[in-house]
Design a protein with these regions (language model features):
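Alpha-helical interface subdomain recognition
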Residues: 1-84, 93, 106-111, 122, ...
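N-terminal glycine-rich flavin-associated loop
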Residues: 88-110, 137
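Glycine-rich phosphate/pyrophosphate-binding beta-alpha loops
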Residues: 96, 136-137, 161-166, 218, ...
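A short, Trp-centered hydrophobic/proline-enriched beta-strand micro-motif
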Residues: 122-131, 175
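Hydrophobic, small-residue-rich alpha-helical packing segments that form membrane-like cores
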Residues: 133-139, 154, 163-164, 189
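Flexible, small-/acidic-enriched active-site or ligand-binding loops
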Residues: 142, 201-231
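A short core secondary-structure module
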Residues: 157-207
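Long, acidic (Asp/Glu-rich), low-complexity accessory segments flanking structured domains
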Residues: 228-246
Length: 399
């Protein structure tokens, strides 16, 4: 096994790693291979984590959560990805952890008291965040889905893309314009967040779902969703009307660090698979791993991943800093480094396997598909660099 225990963990991080790792050990490579091939959500895996309270890792203890911080979440999600679940396996849990954040920070006490304990126990899932639209991807302030107040309800109409896990979630967090863009002073104003009861939306005939056929993350289904006169009670508005965009930004850096940790775990998994195959496969009377042409790409991948890993875990310790731009710089750097390192590592693993690299039975083709995805989500590599160029290097804003 490739030595990757290169980060000095806190006692609590080690405890998280060991406890979560024990659960992950029950789900082998064949489990993830089969679920990816079938496009099947891993309910038993997620339920196993939920039973031990891990979906509430970041929820306050007063609501039944563990009350842990980003440091522990980074250790948890890295462990899941590294175990064999990969990036997509980690994503089956990731949303359950982070989509509750707006509710924790801005929701009414009545709503939090009612829902968060059920989220912490796994009895209710907020696995879905609906933001991206056909004409609003990276430019999220350009969303056109609108929510119009009608008495004690809001009526929501619009179309969203890449709304993932709506098929396995009880609730979703929806971003919609409550004030038209042309009527606000700043483009970041006029957006609000709502907690939507998915079953109620289906019963009213207000949700139309079309699944997106995609190449990566088969265990997580993504949809184009049309909201047609969806009625949401006014008390399901999260926080203050028109301030939803700022609520989304709050906690964004911490989430990117967790994404980086998941990505590093995926990359290490790919390197290990490549090394194992390089030691086992013999050509011309010797193991192919004896050749520098095989060794060097894997070694370079390992080196890049360890650098990204050190940066990510160090950045997780900085999330309490008051200087949010500094935290943003750490988070975007970690995300960028991890995605680049994981992709190069997965590509090297595929190349090491030769023709078998595209054989699903060897898993590395899945790792490559997932590693490519990490360069796109939750923010593109280019936007991460834009942030660094503007906020770290002091260059003019480019967009």
């Amino acid at each position: 096994m490739v030595a990757t225990d290169t980060v000095q963990l806190t006692d609590r991080q080690r405890s998280v790693r060991d406890a979560v790792g024990d659960i992950c050990d029950e789900f082998d490579a064949a489990y993830w291979r089969e679920h990816d091939a079938e496009g099947e959500y891993p309910h038993d895996f997620v339920n196993a984590l939920a039973e031990e309270g891990w979906l509430g890792v970041l929820l306050p203890e007063e609501y039944g959560g563990k009350g842990y911080s980003t440091e522990e979440a980074v250790a948890m999600m890295y462990t899941i990805a590294r175990s064999g679940a990969g990036f997509s396996g980690a994503q089956t849990v990731h949303a359950a952890i982070y989509n509750s954040a707006p509710l924790v920070n801005y929701g009414s006490e009545e709503l939090k008291s009612d829902l968060l304990p059920r989220v912490a126990s796994g009895d209710a899932w907020i696995q879905c965040f609906s933001l991206t639209e056909p004409k609003a991807g990276s430019e999220s302030t350009a969303i056109e889905t609108e929510a119009v107040r009608d008495g004690d309800e809001y009526v929501i109409n619009g179309e969203k893309l890449w709304t993932s896990r709506i098929d396995v979630s009880d609730y979703l967090v929806l971003a919609a314009r409550t004030t038209p863009r042309e009527e606000v002073e700043k483009k970041t104003e006029g957006v609000s967040l709502f907690l939507v009861d998915i079953e109620r939306g289906h019963e009213a005939g207000s949700l139309d779902l079309e699944e997106i056929d995609k190449t990566a993350s088969g265990v997580v289904s993504s949809f184009r969703v049309t909201y047609d006169d969806l009625r949401v009670p006014a008390d399901r508005l999260i926080g203050v009307e028109d301030e939803g965009f700022y609520q989304v930004l709050d906690g964004l850096n911490e989430e990117r660090l967790v994404i980086a940790a998941e990505t590093v775990g995926l990359g290490e998994l790919a390197v290990e698979k490549g090394v194992d195959y390089a030691n086992e496969r013999e050509v011309f009377g010797r193991a192919i791993g004896q050749n520098q042409a095989i060794q060097h790409p894997l070694a370079a991948g390992h080196a890049r991943l360890q650098a990204a890993k050190q940066f990510t875990f160090a950045a997780a310790k900085r999330t309490g800093d008051e200087d949010r731009k500094a935290v943003g710089a750490w988070a975007n750097t970690a995300k960028y480094l991890a995605a680049e390192a994981a992709f190069e590592a997965a590509d090297a693993a595929v190349q090491t396997h030769g023709g078998r690299g595209i054989d699903r039975a060897y898993d590395v083709e899945r790792y490559l598909r997932e590693a490519r995805l990490t360069r796109l989500v939750p923010v593109t590599q280019e936007l991460a660099l834009n942030y660094l160029g503007e906020n770290v290097l002091g260059l003019p804003r480019s967009y």
